[in-house]
Amino acid sequence: MLGSSTRSMFFLLVCIGLLADNRYNVSAMRHREFFLKETQAEKAGVQTEEISKLRSIGVQFKHTLEDQEMLNKNRRVLEEVNKDKIKAEETQERKNKTEDSFKSSKRRVRRGSDPIHNKAQPFS
């Protein structure tokens, strides 16, 4: 009678044997070694013998033109910003808000002690 760990190891060995017959149609990863599909190997210009020895997939695909174009499309380009202009707009908005203090929805509360809530309790 086989134990559960022995059965699982046997199952894994059978699966690996099945994958070995068809290894270029299956992508698998073991100890950070990449087994790439045959089509990916052709794209990268890598010999099929070298596929199992790759340590990083990024190394092979890093410098292709397609990847550079894709990076350029995804890169966000920001305009130059004039900080003085933005500060002037912010101060103008603040001035507009302070001029209209009676129409604002916020209530103003005086600083200092609150006489209503700080009353002495008569029977404490």
UniProtKB/Swiss-Prot annotation:
Superkingdom, taxonomy of origin: Eukaryota
Coiled-coil blocks: 71-109
Listed GO MF terms: receptor serine/threonine kinase binding
GO biological processes: auxin-activated signaling pathway; cell-cell signaling involved in cell fate commitment; maintenance of root meristem identity; phloem development; regulation of auxin mediated signaling pathway; regulation of cell differentiation; regulation of pollen tube growth; response to temperature stimulus
Residues listed as glycosylation sites in the UniProt record: 25, 96
Region (Disordered): 87-124
Compositionally skewed regions (Basic and acidic residues) per UniProt: 87-103
PANTHER family: CLAVATA3/ESR (CLE)-RELATED PROTEIN 45, CLAVATA3_ESR (CLE)-RELATED PROTEIN 45
Protein name from the UniProt record: CLAVATA3/ESR (CLE)-related protein 45
Naturally occurring in which organism (per UniProt): Arabidopsis thaliana
